Amino acid sequence: MANFLLNPKNLPQMLRALQPGMIGAALRYNAAVTARNRRFRSARPHGPWHTTGAIRAIESNERGAILRGEHGALEIYFVSPEVVRVRARADAEFHPPFSYAVVDGAETAPAVECQSAGPGYRLQTSHLICEIAKDSGRLTFRMVDGTPISEDAPGLTWRAGEVRWSRRLPEGEMCYGLGERTGALNLRGRRLRLWNSDPQPAYPSGTDALYASIPFYLGVQFHP
């Protein structure tokens, strides 16, 4: 259907198929969508991006650690030996996340070793290593054999109304997720917006953005 609508040769056939009044209704709908998008468009935040800054203190616990920096704090929380959750807050108030899907007490705390290692801190389980740079709060994750998994560049930053996370993209990592997208399933090499849009009247492969943008990213790596 998309090819039919976008082919100028099919325009006369398409117009003959339309019932009286449909063209006017379609134009009015498009005008209404444009007007509402303009009216309710959110103002873009301004100002510099903030980071945690240099790490000033670390509070280790049975799940990992809370690292307090110059301008914010990081929480490194190991859900299991191979799954870790990272949170960042400017006010350093980390309240327990609520979930309807997890029964209280269902998780078993993994063994986590915390130590100061030269220019950073090191948290390690039986499966993962998390390294935190003291001068910046940047995170690096490795497997226990030293194989890198993820490296911040520069990492978690924020300003009013926005949060940004940047990391180095390892060679060969396949990129999936981010909601409804067109084109190849592996998104590597593309620049995509996390913004919902209703393209009219149709869209070809590669159109961005579409109806559902979800800030969930899945990176798949293969290690021999």
Q: Where is each model-derived feature located?
A:
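N-terminal accessory segment at the very beginning of proteins
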Residues: 1-224
